[in-house]
Amino acid sequence: MYSTLERFLNYVTYDTQSTDEATGVPSTPGQMVLAKVLAKELEQLGVRDVVVTENAYVTGTLPSNIADPEKRKKVPAIGFIAHLDTATEVTGKNVKPRVVKGYDGGDVVLNEAEGYVLSPRDFPFLKDCVGMDLVVTDGNTLLGADNKAGIAEIMGALDYLVAHPEVEHGTVKVAFTPDEEVGHLAKLLDIEAFGADFA
């Protein structure tokens, strides 16, 4: 079992920056690359009916483990959706994530050569992060937490449910979609086939 952080640090290394200049979906090839990686990981976790469409939509199902058929019928299928792409404004190529352990409240030097610093003077919310671990870049790229952190959390939850069959759950549906940053999120997702009662 990988930790959520390990998954996240891996996912951000995939360049999935979308572009609004493309006419097709996905708008960039890196999204399909990550889609295939995630599909393989879902299959390794034991998720069923894993599909990657030609448009880089990934779907899968973790079946209910509720033994009582009457009880199982009453539990809705829950869907979790996250997007593969990262923002168009800043590059997602060659992301170099770094973990700052136990943030002390001061400046975090992202890139000494370039003079990039993450400072609580510029980002006052950092004072709420004292003592926490931070994941940062070298300042030359975006990190891609939107939405690769969501993907990592979903994968972590699935991993936990598979590893802990004593935790009863209804059917869990998963979808990873391309091009949210350019307005396509669920545009080509077959909602009926996805089959979640709530997502």
Give the residues covered by each predicted segment.
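Acidic/histidine-rich catalytic neighborhood of metal-dependent amide-processing enzymes
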Residues: 127-199
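Acidic/His- and Gly-rich active-site-bordering loop/insert found
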Residues: 2-133
